[in-house]
């Protein structure tokens, strides 16, 4: 077997439709587009969500909610992620160095999710009540 002798299985590939190449092809004249109308024309067609002039669903329904821009720069850190940091002092820079958070994060908060395996000192990060209790139970501490 050689690369130049490889070919797809019989019937696995369909030949492309050759539109407008005579009536014998079955796709001559109108080329499968039907007669007249917007969709038969070059460049014809309607945008996504267009409902023929009727007020579309996305405009009939009310707007709601918003996207907090603060959330783009604040990260949630699980307790289990604290073990990924080298050493026992966890800071924002240490989390970035361990690839737990991305470099564009400006602040972070430790949440109660997972388990703390070792005693760690958390510096300069927000901590929830449950996470604080879990860190202190493991022999760690929180520093502002």
UniProtKB/Swiss-Prot annotation:
Repeat among the record's keywords?
A: no
Q: List the disulfide bonds.
A: none
One Gene Ontology cellular component: cytosolic large ribosomal subunit
GO biological process terms, semicolon-separated: translation
InterPro entries assigned to the protein according to its UniProt record, in alphabetical order: Ribosomal_uL15, Ribosomal_uL15/eL18, Ribosomal_uL15/eL18_sf, Ribosomal_uL15_bac-type, Ribosomal_uL15_CS
Top-rank taxon, per record: Bacteria
Give this protein's Gene Ontology molecular function annotations: rRNA binding; structural constituent of ribosome
User: Which keywords does this chain's UniProt record carry?
Assistant: Ribonucleoprotein, Ribosomal protein, RNA-binding, rRNA-binding
Q: Which PROSITE patterns match?
A: RIBOSOMAL_L15
Q: Where is this region: Disordered?
A: 1-53
Q: Where is the composition biased (Gly residues)?
A: 21-31
Subunit field text: Part of the 50S ribosomal subunit.
HAMAP family per the UniProt record, alphabetical: Ribosomal_uL15
The job of this chain, per UniProt, is described as: Binds to the 23S rRNA.
Q: Which family does it belong to?
A: Belongs to the universal ribosomal protein uL15 family.
* Name of this chain's protein: Large ribosomal subunit protein uL15
Q: Which organism is it from?
A: Glaesserella parasuis serovar 5 (strain SH0165) (Haemophilus parasuis)
């Amino acid at each position: 077997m050689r690369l130049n002798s490889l070919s797809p299985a019989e019937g696995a590939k369909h030949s492309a439709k050759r539109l407008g190449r005579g009536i014998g092809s079955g796709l001559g004249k109108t080329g499968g587009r039907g007669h007249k109308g917007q969709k038969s024309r070059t460049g014809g067609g309607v945008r996504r969500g267009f409902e023929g002039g009727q007020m579309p669903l996305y405009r009939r329904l009310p707007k709601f909610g918003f996207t907090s821009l603060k959330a783009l720069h604040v990260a949630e850190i699980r307790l289990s992620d604290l073990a990924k940091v080298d050493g026992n002092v966890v800071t924002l820079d240490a989390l970035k160095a361990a690839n737990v958070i991305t470099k564009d994060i400006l602040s972070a908060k430790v949440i109660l999710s997972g388990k703390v395996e070792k005693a760690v000192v958390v510096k300069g990060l927000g901590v929830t009540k449950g996470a604080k209790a879990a860190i202190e139970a493991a022999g760690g501490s929180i520093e502002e």
